[in-house]
Swiss-Prot record:
Signal peptide: 1-20
Species of provenance: Arthroderma benhamiae (strain ATCC MYA-4681 / CBS 112371) (Trichophyton mentagrophytes)
Family as reported in the entry's similarity comment: Belongs to the type-B carboxylesterase/lipase family.
Stated name of the protein: Secreted lipase ARB07186/07185
Record flagged with keyword Secreted: yes
Amino acid sequence: MAKYDFVMLWILTLTAAIAAARPMVVDKGRQITYTGLDRNGIEVFLGIPFGHDTGGKNRFKPPVAVVPPRGSHINATVYGPICPQELRAGSRGKLVISENCLNLNIGRPKNMTSHDKLAVMVTIYGGGYWVGHNQDPRWHADNMVKESVANGRPIIHVAMNYRLGVFGFAQTTALRTERSENAALRDQRLALEWVRDNIAAFGGDPKRVTIFGQSSGGVSVGMQMLAYGGKQPVPYQQGICQSQVLEPGITGNFTSTAMELVTDKANCTSGDFNSEAALACLRELDTETLLAAAIATYQNGVDHNIGDIWLPSVDGDFLPDAPSVLVAQRRFAPVTSMMGWCEDDVTRFVYPNITTSKGVADFIASYAPNVSRKNIDTLLKLYPTDEFPENKTAGLSRDFYRTARIFRDIVMTCEPFLVGEHAAAEGADAYFFSWNQTIAPSALGVLHGADLPYVYANLSAYIPPGSPIRPTASDYELSHRASRSWSTFGSTKEPSLPGHNTFKGFRKSFSKHNEILVFVAGGPNEGLSNIDDHGPHSVIGGQKLRERCAFINSPEMIHELRF
C-alpha cells in the first residue's frame, strides 16, 4: 500500500508540474484564463473560439461573436474543428469537420507578458475558397516567430478559420435580402475584431496588426481593405497580398451557377434557387448532405476560373460595389500594403500542348470568355512570341510560356499595380515584390506558392514524403531574409531594416518621377528593380509591365474580366 501511495503521489506531482509548466494567459479585464502549450520553442494557444456555431438556423448567416462569461477558463491545448470542405485522402479521419469551426490559434515567443505590446501577424489561408484550415502545418508560424525574435523585432502570430465553398460564399437573392452573403469574409472580419479586442492580454499590440494571405488568402486581404467601401474603422493597420489581391470573375456568374447546381443536387430547388423556400431547405440539410452536394457539383479547370468558383459577392453591404469600382473611387482603407507575385505564378495551370498564337488566344478565351476578340488580339501584340523562350527538353514551346505570362499578368501581377497606384494617391505606402526562387526547380519555373516555404521559414513542411527535393544553402538563407522581412514589415511598416538580416533596399514602389519599383526576392539578381529599366541586368524591366498592365487595367478590360 505504501508503495502504491508513493507511485500515486509521484504521478500527481508530475501531472501538477506539467500543468504548471504550461503557458497561461490571464485577461484581467474580462477575467478569462487561457491555457496553452509549448511547441517548437514557442508558446501556442489552440482552438480559441471567436464565433458561435454556424450550422442549422445560423447557416450562411453572419457570424455571432463568442463572449465567454467572466471567470471562464479556456483550454487552448487542442485544435478546434475545421470548416466543412473536401479533404485529401491522407487527411480523412484525422481532422474533425464541423460548422462550429470559427476558432483561431495564437503563437508567441516564450515568457511574454501583457505589457510587451508586440506586433501581430494574422494569416488568412488560401485554397481557392474551397479548402484550407488553420491546422495545416504549412501555415504553422513557429519558425517565423522564432526568426522574428532572432531579428530583434518579435511578433505574435494568429491563424483563423473561416467558412468555405457554399458554406461561406452562398449567393442568392434571399440571402442578399437578409444581408447574409459574404459569410466567409464576415468570419474573417470577426476574427480580426477578436484580435483587436483580446490580443493585448497575450502581449500583442492591437494597433500594430498586419493581415496577410496568399492566393485566395491574398484576395481576402484585398476584400478586407475594400470592406464597407472604407466607411468603417478597420481592425488592422497593414496588409500583405501574395499572388492575388483582386480576382477576375467576382462580378461574373461563377458563384451563382455553382449555387444553382448545389441547390438542385441537394433537391432544394423549388423552381427558383434564389427563393426563400430554397434557402430554408438548404438550412434544414445536415452538414454531410450539403457538403456532398457541393463536392459533387464542384467544377475545376481553366474554363471554370481554375476552380475558383466560390467568390465574394457584390452584396451592397460588405462589398457595396464591384472591387474595381471601389478601387477607382478610392473607397477603401488606405493602409500600408505589400503585394506581389511569383515569377511564373500560373504556369502549372497552362496547357502544355499550346504551340501557336491560336492556342494562346483559345486559352485566354476559355479562361475569360467575355474578353472580346479585339482585346485578345491586342494582348497577342503586347506579348509577341519571340520575346519568350522555348524548352525543347521539356517539350514546352514559346507560345506556352507566352500564354503563361499573359495569364500571370491578368490574374496576379497587374491588379497590385491598380490597387497600389490608387492607395499611394491616398497617402498609403505600397511595396511590390516578384518572387524568383523555389525549393523545387523545374521547367515550369517559380510557381504559385513558391514564396510560402520561405516566408514561414518552414521549408520541410512543403516537401512531400519521399520527394527528391533538397533545399540548398541558398534556400535556407533566403528563408531567413524572407521571414524576417515579413515580420519586420509587421513591426515597422517597412520590409527592410538596416543592420538586420532582411531584404536589402526594399523600398516603397511609388516614390518619385512616376517610377514604379519592384523588389525581386531570391534568385541570382535579388534587389530593387525599376519596371522601366531595360538594362541587361534588369529582371523586371524586360517584362514591359507599365505598357502591358496599362492595357489589362483599362476600364474595358476590367469590365470584360468581370471584377
